[in-house]
Amino acid sequence: MNPKVPMTLEGAQQLKEELKRRKTTDRKRIIAAIEEARAHGDLSENAEYHAAKEQQSFNEGRIAKLEGMLASAEVIDTSRLNSSRIVFGAKVTVIDEDTEEESTYHIVGDEEADLEKGKISISSPMARGMIGKEAGDSIEVRAPGGTRHFEVVEITF
């Protein structure tokens, strides 16, 4: 049995929406493209047919992956959390003690992580350094690029 993987309610909803779209809209579009390409005759040299079959393979693989992720997800409604300590689902504002630069990170599940959107994986060095800390605490993060020091400014959910 696969261990449960933490996931925010928002992340689970996004995966469900993608799964629904892939099973309905995308699947129908790809099947129509295959049918159209088949109508062009000889399949051995039909680039449109092979491209559509490749799309179908990718789409079905992604559907299987999404179903697996959702089946193993332990969905956590972070809006119900209220803690003075940093836990999964927290939005944490920190200041880099070296550069004085302020950043906000949302601690999410591995599948939801997106650094460009400020979402970091619960298993990342940054999140592991944050868990259990409170506002005002210092954090030491050991990463491949070296050790960094941050101060926790604010924790919200």
Curated annotation (Swiss-Prot):
Coiled coil: 9-30
Entries under Pfam families matching the protein: GreA_GreB, GreA_GreB_N
The keyword Lyase belongs to this UniProt entry's keyword annotation: no
InterPro entries: GreA/GreB_C_sf (IPR036953), TF_GreA/GreB_CS (IPR018151), Tscrpt_elong_fac_GreA (IPR006359), Tscrpt_elong_fac_GreA/B (IPR028624), Tscrpt_elong_fac_GreA/B_C (IPR001437), Tscrpt_elong_fac_GreA/B_fam (IPR023459), Tscrpt_elong_fac_GreA/B_N (IPR022691), Tscrpt_elong_fac_GreA/B_N_sf (IPR036805)
Entry's transmembrane regions: none
Gene Ontology MF terms in the entry: DNA binding; RNA polymerase binding
GO biological process: DNA-templated transcription elongation; regulation of DNA-templated transcription elongation
Superkingdom of origin: Bacteria
Alphabetical UniProt keywords: Coiled coil, DNA-binding, Transcription, Transcription regulation
PROSITE patterns (alphabetical): GREAB_1 (PS00829), GREAB_2 (PS00830)
UniProt function note: Necessary for efficient RNA polymerase transcription elongation past template-encoded arresting sites. The arresting sites in DNA have the property of trapping a certain fraction of elongating RNA polymerases that pass through, resulting in locked ternary complexes. Cleavage of the nascent transcript by cleavage factors such as GreA or GreB allows the resumption of elongation from the new 3'terminus. GreA releases sequences of 2 to 3 nucleotides.
HAMAP family associated with the record: GreA_GreB (MF_00105)
Family label: Belongs to the GreA/GreB family.
Name the record gives this protein: Transcription elongation factor GreA
The species this protein was found in: Magnetococcus marinus (strain ATCC BAA-1437 / JCM 17883 / MC-1)
